């Protein structure tokens, strides 16, 4: 099945969320947006909170998906994470005792539009 760009991104984020859940994480937020930016997934495990950028591609023709996470994108993600932790939380200081990590999840649909052929590369501490 061929997807629109938005559908493809949404599909990648759904697969990434399931992947993290299988690794023992609980998804706290999906597509968190605030006035300073957006984060694809926010997930937690015991003592760890991760802010995760998801990048999906049909091929590596234009490079690795994570290469699209440039300095500007990193700056926006960090600002958004800071906002989330200090301003956007309904319960402030909820994650004060958690380690914070920034990850990138690369999803490469190696079978083209076939959903059953997906390579996932989880880059922990990506930045």
Predicted features and spans:
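Acidic-basic catalytic patches of nuclease active cores, encompassing PD-(D/E)XK
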Residues: 1-30
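Residues at secondary-structure transition points
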Residues: 3, 7, 11, 36, ...
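Active-site metal-binding core of divalent-cation-utilizing nuclease and nuclease-like domains
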Residues: 26-49
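Structural motif
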Residues: 36, 49-51, 99, 120
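Anionic group-transfer/hydrolysis microenvironments
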Residues: 40-42, 55-57, 105-108, 126
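Conserved catalytic cores of phosphodiester-cleaving nucleases, focusing on short active-site segments
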Residues: 41-61, 65, 77
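Mid-chain, well-packed structural core segment of small domains
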Residues: 67-96
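Domain-level recognition of nuclease-like catalytic cores that cleave nucleotide substrates
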Residues: 88-127
């Amino acid at each position: 099945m061929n997807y629109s760009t938005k559908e493809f991104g949404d599909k990648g984020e759904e697969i990434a969320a399931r992947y993290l859940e299988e690794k023992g994480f609980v998804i706290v937020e999906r597509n968190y947006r605030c006035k300073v930016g957006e984060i694809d997934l926010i997930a937690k495990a015991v003592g760890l909170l991760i802010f995760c950028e998801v990048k999906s591609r049909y091929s590596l023709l234009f490079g690795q998906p994570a290469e699209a996470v440039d300095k500007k994108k990193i700056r926006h993600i960090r600002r958004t994470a800071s906002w989330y932790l200090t301003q956007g939380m309904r319960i402030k200081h909820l994650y004060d005792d958690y380690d914070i990590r920034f990850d990138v999840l690369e999803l490469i649909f190696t079978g083209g539009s076939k959903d059953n052929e997906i390579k996932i590369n989880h880059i922990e501490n990506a930045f």
